[in-house]
């Protein structure tokens, strides 16, 4: 059993909604400093224009810099400033999609908190009830924000192999899945029961 859970990921991301955050390509929820800005600008000059650097400089000392996949990795790395960094989890959005063995198209999104939402070049975390938390830059905000899944452009959902999705969450089988044809009413783990997709 993994020490990291889908429930824990959602709790961490919900906490991040209350922090002062700003989007920084390649960031891992680290305190914004001039050295951090300079380092990331050298790594990814395409994403650090002069105007963007000036914006980031106004956040020095008061904000945490992160990107979408960095927010997931910061949970695995022990939280703010990543005190428990491990290279085996240091991957990009496509890497997370590729390593997942359990995934599907967004139309089949199960009602399971902690699933990763994916579109090319971007990820978020499903928190239930048709909502997502993501770290983004653009019309949806700058930093960690909560958004609606519908109409956002997500193409797939997936489970990360490093997270335990068996958080003891159970549901009573009563939908129109095949097992209900036998009048099954036993509590079942949400990962083993068909659930209706989010509209």
Q: Predicted regions span which residues?
A:
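N-terminal capping segments
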Residues: 1-81, 120-122, 133-135, 139, ...
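Surface-exposed intrinsically disordered loops and tails
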Residues: 34-58, 83, 87-106, 147, ...
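Loop/turn positions that initiate beta-strands
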Residues: 112-115
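A short, compositionally biased micro-patch
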Residues: 117-120, 127
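Short, surface-exposed beta-strand/loop "edge" segments at domain boundaries and coil↔beta transitions
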Residues: 123-125, 199
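Catalytic Cys-His active-site segments of thiol-dependent hydrolases/isopeptidases
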Residues: 125-152
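Low-complexity, Gly/Ser/Thr/Pro-rich intrinsically disordered linker/tail segments
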Residues: 152-199
């Amino acid at each position: 059993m993994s020490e990291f859970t889908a429930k824990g990921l959602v709790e961490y991301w919900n906490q991040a909604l209350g922090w002062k955050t700003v989007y920084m390509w390649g960031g891992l929820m680290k305190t914004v400093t001039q050295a951090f800005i300079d380092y990331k600008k050298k790594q990814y000059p395409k994403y650090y224009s002069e105007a963007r650097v000036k914006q980031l400089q106004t956040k020095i000392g008061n904000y945490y810099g992160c990107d979408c996949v960095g927010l997931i990795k910061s949970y695995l790395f022990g939280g703010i400033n990543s005190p428990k960094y491990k290279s085996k989890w240091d991957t990009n959005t496509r890497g997370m999609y590729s390593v997942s063995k359990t995934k599907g198209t967004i139309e089949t999104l199960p009602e399971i908190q902690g699933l990763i939402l994916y579109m090319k070049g971007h990820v978020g975390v499903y928190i239930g009830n048709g909502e997502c938390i993501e770290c983004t830059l653009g019309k949806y905000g700058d930093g960690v924000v909560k958004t609606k899944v519908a109409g956002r452009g997500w193409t797939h959902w997936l489970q990360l192999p490093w997270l335990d999705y068996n958080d003891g969450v159970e549901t009573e089988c009563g939908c129109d899945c095949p097992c209900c044809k036998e009048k099954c009413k036993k509590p079942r783990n949400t990962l083993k029961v068909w659930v209706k997709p989010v509209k």
